[in-house]
From Swiss-Prot:
Recorded coiled-coil stretches: none
Organism encoding this protein: Lactococcus lactis subsp. cremoris (strain SK11)
HAMAP family attached to this UniProt entry: UPF0298
Name of the protein in its database record: UPF0298 protein LACR_0404
Entry similarity comment: Belongs to the UPF0298 family.
Pfam family, one: DUF2129
UniProt keyword terms in alphabetical order: Cytoplasm
Record-linked InterPro entries: DUF2129
């Protein structure tokens, strides 16, 4: 055990990802979308797919996706813009419930 060399551990860099919703005219073209990002979900009935793409590549990819013949429209997810701290909402809800129970 003493002969094992200690190697430097490199830090793990997590790249920011963005959700991109791609609406298509038909379901046939959704297979081709895997070239542009990771397909997380695709709906046959609603003809849309959810891709996750690196944040720094979004602007170029949106233009490329819009140029495809089978793509109807492209939307970017807004989860990064939303406040995800729900503790204040829970406190407010608890206070409202307590007030209703007291009356």
């Amino acid at each position: 055990m003493e002969n094992i060399e200690k190697k430097e551990i490199r830090p793990l860099y997590i790249r920011e990802r963005v959700a991109v919703y791609v609406y298509c005219y038909s379901y046939k073209g959704t297979r081709q979308l895997s070239r542009f990002g990771d397909i997380v979900y695709s709906s046959q009935k609603s003809h849309y797919s959810l891709l996750y793409v690196n944040n720094d590549e979004v602007a170029d990819l949106l233009n490329k996706l819009k140029e495809l013949r089978f793509v109807k429209k492209v939307r970017v997810g807004h989860i990064k813009e939303l406040d995800q701290n729900f503790s204040e909402a829970f406190i407010q809800t608890n206070l409202e419930v307590k007030e209703e129970l007291e009356h």
